[in-house]
């Protein structure tokens, strides 16, 4: 089982063929060699967390189709875009608002934020083809990259890998991670990071244009072209609010996160915001549903067959004599910097999360705290390379930031992340006392 799992993960990383195809081949081999039977293998496709991911993909399509995501972004630019730093904060704010209902940070960064940043940059004659990328474009691109990763770490439903981590935590350490306890643990360090990181980037990599008085006029013109808010956008706002409320209070009224997502999608279909063709055309959701289900099934089998517990105890014994805080820090640092070998955050979570969580728990670390910290860093570790995750190649390929600059600044910001204890301490203090 382990050999097939490793082979599948390597295939997901190197992608000699699409990740879904690699997963199907791995699934077939698992049954063919007799590790498990077909009935057991297909159980992964009934996992509620995986269906939550698919439903949230469909919901996020509503933001794009109705134009609501773009309208929100333009409103932020209109209100806060008089200075370049304020412009960056406004864009990060939009990402923050959209994050809870968008399980693809690639969709947020590439489908909504990147077109806005490109248009803004061009309006200030900031173009890498003309050698003027440093005017505003470089700063906005790099700030959005880091802001996107932070917002992805703040909400359970903001990145597909978070929901995989939730599932693995339940199966590996019997830790029940909910939307609410993830949010409560992440909110303070997340907000602090969203305030501090753009300012640090502003000092490290300052734009040559500090004032952007024309941004407000540009945004107002774009909003005028969009016209008044449409009925479909109003429905989208209403459904989004209902989904957020149910994600927050659902555990108290017997409505879990997956059912909430199904309710939201049903409302979007009933109101006509989305039609069935939209659902069928959301290939990212169906693709994720297939390969995620296979990887979760494999990881679950490794745990049931005793491999993950054995590996966790073996590594924990090699770290014998160290206190659990030291062990957890070592594991997080290893988790973070090993991402240089990965081109997908979700693939990295699939490969290492369960084993590292098992080691932390065996070493005596609080299970929920360990699960959440590794969950957060499953997003933050993508702040390493220009191929680290879906948003990275999209933003890097625009040409506003060179590869050398991208790597060096990420290295510096990564060091800052570990030398500043306050966000981690605050996460610890905000952690719910029970799972």
Language-model region placement:
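Alpha-helical transmembrane segments
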Residues: 48-55, 103-108, 184-197, 371-378
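Re-entrant/interfacial helical elements at transmembrane boundaries that shape
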Residues: 106-122, 141, 154-171, 311-313, ...
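Generic alpha-helical transmembrane segments of integral inner-membrane proteins
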Residues: 6, 28, 93, 97, ...
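Intrinsically disordered, low-complexity non-transmembrane regions of multi-pass membrane transporters
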Residues: 122-135, 204-238
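Flexible hinge motifs at transmembrane-helix junctions and intramembrane kinks/re-entrant loops
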Residues: 7-24, 41, 199-203, 230, ...
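Membrane-embedded alpha-helical segments and adjacent helix-loop junctions characteristic
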Residues: 20-21, 25-130, 282-288, 292-363
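Conserved small/polar residues in nucleotide/adenosyl-binding loops
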Residues: 418-427
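Alpha-helical transmembrane segments of multi-pass membrane proteins
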Residues: 85-99, 125-151, 177-185, 324-337, ...
């Amino acid at each position: 089982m382990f050999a097939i799992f490793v082979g599948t993960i390597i295939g997901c990383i190197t992608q000699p063929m699409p990740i879904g195809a690699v997963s199907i081949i791995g699934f077939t081999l698992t049954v063919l060699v007799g590790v498990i039977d077909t009935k057991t293998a297909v159980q992964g496709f009934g996992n509620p967390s995986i269906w939550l991911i698919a439903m949230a993909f469909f919901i996020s399509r509503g933001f794009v189709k109705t134009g609501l995501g773009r309208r929100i972004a333009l409103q932020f630019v209109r209100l806060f875009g008089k200075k370049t730093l304020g412009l960056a904060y406004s864009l990060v704010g939009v990402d923050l608002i959209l994050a809870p209902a968008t399980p693809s940070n690639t969709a947020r960064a590439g489908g909504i934020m990147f077109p806005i940043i490109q248009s803004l940059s061009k309006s200030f004659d900031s173009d890498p083809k003309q050698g003027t990328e440093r005017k505003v474009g470089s700063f906005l691109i790099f700030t959005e990259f880091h802001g996107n990763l932070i917002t992805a770490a703040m909400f359970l439903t903001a990145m597909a890998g978070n929901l995989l981590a939730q599932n693995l935590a339940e199966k590996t350490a019997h830790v029940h991670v909910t939307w609410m306890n993830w949010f409560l643990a992440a909110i303070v360090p997340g907000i602090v990071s969203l305030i501090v990181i753009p300012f640090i980037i502003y000092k490290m990599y300052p734009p040559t244009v500090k004032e952007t008085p024309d941004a407000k006029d540009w945004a107002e013109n774009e909003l005028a072209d969009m016209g008044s808010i449409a009925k479909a956008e109003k429905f989208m706002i209403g459904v989004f609010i209902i989904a957020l409320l149910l994600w927050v209070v659902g555990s108290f009224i017997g409505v879990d996160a997956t059912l909430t997502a199904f309710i939201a999608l049903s409302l979007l279909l009933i109101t006509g915001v989305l039609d069935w063709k939209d659902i069928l055309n959301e290939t990212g959701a169906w693709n994720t549903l297939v390969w995620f289900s296979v990887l979760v099934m494999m990881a679950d089998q490794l745990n049931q067959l005793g491999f993950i517990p054995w590996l966790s105890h073996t590594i924990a014994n090699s770290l014998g004599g160290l206190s659990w805080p030291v062990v957890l820090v070592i594991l997080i640092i290893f988790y973070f910097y090993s991402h240089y070998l990965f081109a997908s955050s979700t693939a990295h979570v699939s490969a290492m999360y369960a084993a590292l969580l098992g080691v932390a728990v065996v070493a005596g670390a609080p299970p929920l705290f360990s699960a959440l910290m590794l969950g957060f860093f499953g997003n933050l570790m993508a702040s390493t390379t220009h191929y680290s995750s879906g948003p990275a190649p999209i933003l890097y390929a625009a040409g506003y930031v060179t590869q050398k600059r991208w790597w060096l600044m990420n290295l510096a910001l990564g060091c800052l992340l570990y030398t500043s204890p306050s966000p981690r301490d605050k996460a610890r203090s905000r952690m719910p006392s029970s799972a």
